[in-house]
Amino acid sequence: MPLFFYKRPGLVVYVTCGDPDLATTRAVVLAAIEAGADVIELGVPFSDPVADGPVIQRASERALKHGTCLAQVLTLAAEVRQHAQSTGLVVFSYLNPLLRMGMEKFCLVARHAGVDGVLVTDLPVEEASEYLRAMKANDLAPIFLAAPTSPDARLKRIAQASRGFVYAVSRTGVTGARQKLADDAQKLVRRLRRVTKLPVAVGFGISNAEQFAEVAKFADAVVVGSAIVETIERNRGREAAAVGEFVKKLSAVSPQP
């Protein structure tokens, strides 16, 4: 199914799969969907997550200790898809795990698992031709990161290569919840609107309902990642319930048809 935001602002929830274990991840994802998440980003743990801040780095370390791998993430996606037909599922990964599996095999397995899109955080659009061919052949949506520092020509190229939505990075640097959002985020969304009609989702640093509401004024969707992972980290034994409560607060923010 295509990625689609049924309400505005849409809510994209990121989880690191396998933290603290895959069964808990499954419960957390289903709780987030029930609480109102439109799209779930299934994070593939990686040993060198250079784009991630300390919260997601710790989550990756915990998941890798249990041996969580890309194949298990795709199995998890298939299980989630059985319970949630209309929720967007995006695999969020560094490039190396995909290359180890093989790009063609990954795309084929992802499609059969019910995955809608893929975001490869360290794959520049300029080097993505083979990846884009495999994605197109399997009707998967490639999603690229657009940064405030990107020149207009590069934003246009990113927008042209993306399907589903464009992920606008609210600021430069690594992921992680922040108390204040950069003004660059709104400017970046305006720039993207000039080159694409795709929905624009803003992420990196949104950690509470107030920030969600602020970003929702100018973005089509809001991505919440580190704050979700930190909620899991702080609520051992009740991860799914805690995430469900947090997502409900976010979902209640000024919905617009």
Predicted regions: what they are:
Residues P2-F5, L22, S47-R58, K65-A78, ...:
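Active-site-adjacent beta->alpha loops and helix N-cap segments on the catalytic face
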Residues L22-I33, S150-A159, V202, I206-V222:
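Catalytic cores of alpha/beta
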Residues V13, A32, I40-G43, A110, ...:
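Conserved, mostly hydrophobic/aromatic
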Residues M1-V15, A77-Q82:
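N-terminal amphipathic alpha-helix/helix-capping segment at the start of soluble metabolic enzymes
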Residues L11-V15, I40-L42, L89-S93, V118-V120, ...:
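Hydrophobic faces of well-ordered beta-strands that scaffold small-molecule active sites
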Residues A37-S47, A113-L119, P124, A168-G176, ...:
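Glycine-rich phosphate-binding active-site loops on the catalytic face of alpha/beta enzymes
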Residues L11-A27, G88-G102, A141-S150, R178:
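Active-site mouth loops of central-metabolism enzymes
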Residues R190-L198, S207-P257:
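Alpha/beta catalytic cores of nucleotide-metabolism and tRNA/nucleoside-modifying enzymes
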